[in-house]
């Protein structure tokens, strides 16, 4: 094609056949050879072209307000173009002539690579599209021209087999982002996870996009080096040899060598270009690369984040920086308040003898980190029951200072809410204690708590003969309701690691191995998420919409507590509320069984849930997606009885003083076991899973457990009006952060939920690994103990340290900031001045 008259676009006859010096058809015939050249890293690659190969001077940035796109379809062999090329040309021409007037553009298509050595012609194009086959489609001088074009701020879009072009060029590999593995893909229908909900190429697409294409595998997964906007879900098709696993990028972008590059592995079929959604995908890519709109192509590039430790190791014999980490919250002015549970009290020894009045006495500490001074202040310390060291279930303890929240009007009133177990409230004879939620007042000038200002809002009994499961997290909604997470106050033993439902073990008449006494009991505040409305005088009222009113007359009345919003949770250490939607998010630790049992039920499942309404989450009757446990009871708890009915659970424990007939169980969104994420099994006619390991399928392939302890995180909300230069990008807006205390295969991810299904146990539609952003490993944040976003948009994280029931030199507060800069291109380099 003659490129002299560039104002003449090829849109007038979108279906006409073009003849170029290299034809697509010949490339397809030679595809096996081209693929072989790209089959692995051993292929000999050449570096970026020597700048001396060209003296071109490209206008910076290329193209102007009369936006033009150059579509190059050259290939390594000559001949007629293929129907695929013609379909792609027609689609891009159509895209350029639709949409708002200020987002339209003209298209010039050519198979003549000499255009890349003509700086005047090249300077007129805002973007170059490669609709090429494989092979060496550019000679060194032509590639040098393309490089000069990108360095001047040009745009590039690569489609499908463009990733096979220039197989010996490192620079072109960087431009594309990845190379296909050997072999030719066949057309298969699959699900594309559209994780980027803000990029113009993806924001209008469904989160789960089902479509047919030729799905390429990558020699080296580009995740972390590029910004992935969509990935293909391998469980929905047969990826074949060289599969990339759950993280299989299919479309991505990045700022590259001065310009903007977008690549999609889709577009390998003629029918792709007839799809409205696929054309919208290409349209968004072209709008960004032509500089018609700005977009962020940096958000998931892991090098754009900085993790820094904020606190120093404690001085010997002092907890001047941090206690045994157990939760954090940020104030509107950026201060970070974090608590120590009560272990590692440097001022006194661990006492485990119940005859000693000091048994379990510890200091629950509240520290404050000030980002302005970068100094830490010990705001106060409560005398808690919580310092018994490690050991077995009848020695160790998880009570202490468990949770912290700041009043919604904290900047004005200084009110701090603490969830804790005062040492003064223990009964050593009965081995019972009082748990409470108290309000204290902080002096803003000194960052000191006035311990005499305590107002006790809520208190309830807990058994302390046996460890464990205290919960602790708290969170506010926009209506001033306070959510309080409590554990089931139950031993992990006596049930083989399955349902905590052994009614027999007790101490002076109080069961410590039967979670039906607590989590499954409508009349007990343990194993719950409570919801109350604190009042200024230190009392509370009950909001409408809790699971019970406390006034139910069922089964004789007096068998419910109106504070209960959620029942049936085991150990919810962390909860959060999305400030935009008021939806509650929670995670809880499961039991200890290493494998499922056809006799007793599922293996240990750690769990995350999106909670949109008051509900029963199942413990100790059901876990995961409503997988039941086996009942047991007196006189012989070792003998299995019937399977629990998740839709009609009954509490028939002798330790129950609440309702027998319970609300139906709501399934969870995320659950995982040592074998993998989202284990599921075939079910019989009664809905009971087989629980046979060799019949398991894993619905969440991006995680698994082992040692596991779910650590719920926040939902990120991007502050568009904020001026912070460290805030995480808008890409993360609305994504839910889910993690685990451990850092191997366990989750440390941000997930995207479907609002239509999330309240009924719907699975995440997309998951993004954070392990290279919130760094794992001994020198990173190995033992995640809490995380939240501050008003600056940075992520604040607690690392528990490397021991248990203590702090050590690795116990620390960290901050993870974004350093990648804003969207591109710069506002003053937009092609038409405004977006």
Task: Put a short name on every predicted segment.
Residues 296-302, 344-364, 390-394, 399-401, ...:
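Beta-propeller domain segments
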Residues 48-125:
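Aromatic-Pro/Gly-enriched surface loop or interdomain linker
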Residues 49-64, 94, 237, 242-249, ...:
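Extracellular ligand-binding/catalytic regions of CAZymes and related secreted enzymes
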Residues 130, 135-205:
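A glycine-rich, often tryptophan-bearing local segment used as a flexible ligand/cofactor-contacting loop or short
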Residues 54, 99, 178, 183-258:
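Catalytic beta-strand/loop cores that center a nucleophilic Ser/Cys/Thr
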Residues 431-475:
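Asp-box/WD-like beta-propeller blade repeats and closely related beta-sheet repeat scaffolds
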Residues 1-47:
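Secretory targeting and sorting signals
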Residues 330-333, 406-412, 476-479, 578-581, ...:
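Residue-level detector of Asp-centered blade-edge/turn motifs that repeat once per structural unit
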